[in-house]
Amino acid sequence: MKRLPILLILGMLGFVSCSRPAQESLKPRIVVMTDIGPAEVEPDDNESAVRLMAYADRFEIEGIITTIGWNCDPYPEEWAVYLERVIDAYEVDVQNLMKRSGQKGFRTPEMENATQELGYWPSADYIRGRTVMGSRRAGIGVIGPDNDSPGSELLIRLADEDDDRPIWLCSWGGANTFAQAVWRVQQERTEAELKRFLRKFRLYTITDQDMVWAMRMNRAYSSHQWLRRDFADDLLLVWDESAWLNQNELGKANWDKYERFIQGKGEMGKVYPKFLWGVEGDTPSFLNVMPNGLNDPDDPEQVGWGGCHRFGLSPDGETSAWTNWQQPLKDISNAYEHKFYPDEFNDFAARMQWADTGAGNLNPVVVLDGNTGIKPLEIDARPGETLTFDASRSYDPDGDSLTFDWWFQEFPGQALYPDIDQSSGAKVRVTVPGTPGAYHLVCEVHDDGPFRLPAYRRIIVKVP
């Protein structure tokens, strides 16, 4: 289905490649499971779908699966038309969005179904071809021989592909479709093969929505509990109970900005509905994977735009997951979610301006000690050592001026942090404490153009 030989002409994109792209230049792989529906029932999934399409150059969208959630059981098949409306709007706006990266056209279907590099905008037909129906009934009770779906079959095919990148499952509704795929593999393959299957995936759930709203506290009803209980050793599962709530509430508090900068901007802005319960509550599931240099999502303790999480007891009181519902982590994650909200909104608003007009601001590029990547830099240091970091070669594609802010991420139980000299300059000196540990320094950069766009780079200072 994917991963065709790369020794092909890339077609109309405007450049030619004759070898497999470097791993860091490839997009992260994601699959969305959404209970999208009418705006008067489920507006936030429509909103999150618009934002996802505005970032289609940052994610390899392997699938969008329509499925059950708090508002529906069974999932009405006709609701999938609301996802189609967003994709249709993207088909119009992508002609402007491609101007952000100088893209002149789309690759052939065969090449679009191979790997995609960061910056490539896929065609609407590519996304349509990966939009399928998943489980239409909720709960662990329906998992079994009669619950296979195009969505569960897609997940199995994706896991079987020759691709080392993990697949992030963004659960906007229930993850019942994935649970069915796990069950099917468990029935038909060896234990070792099941483990390999599970280790291909990372699951980020927006609370637990594998049931209707009235049953939301019945954790045992959900297939998520089965996944956490039986597969915790092999499946990275994030159960968020902070970022989605803040996304909802901060969006409501700032709705005037959505009316001004999001709604009506391009065709996608025209299908971005007014909130009902909250704004884009599902968006943190893919913001967590955003390849912007702030975090490595494979380490959920690293804070990103989707919050931060620590492995421990989940809200059901029985199973464990990467979560943030307990103190002190809940307050820490909450503070960072408030801190980053202006950045992630402004970034979105700037992209919607591109969708509308084909022009706009571009993000700065962090160059840290001569390195332009986005993966965290790891530095070994001695207790008491002074380290120097230089981001002075960072630049803005539009020629905007840059400001710098350096800070250490707060972790529960970490009492001492290195001292930073000149935390607002392009160069900093850091004095390492005598206490062993890993200290996470973030270089945060903003331009002074419209929407004051951000860029980040993380440095992990390891002290033995």
Specify the residue positions occupied by each region the protein language model found.
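Short beta-strand edge segments in extracellular beta-sheet folds
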Residues: 460-464
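Positively charged n-region of N-terminal signal peptides that target proteins for export
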Residues: 1-4
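N-terminal acidic, glycine/proline-rich low-complexity segments
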Residues: 20-388, 394-416, 427-429, 438
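Short, solvent-exposed loop/turn segments at the edges of extracellular beta-sandwich modules
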Residues: 446-452
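Short beta-strand segments within Ig-like beta-sandwich modules, predominantly Fibronectin type-III
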Residues: 419-424
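Extracellular and select intracellular beta-sandwich modules with Ser/Thr-enriched
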Residues: 452-459
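Bacterial N-terminal signal peptides
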Residues: 6-14
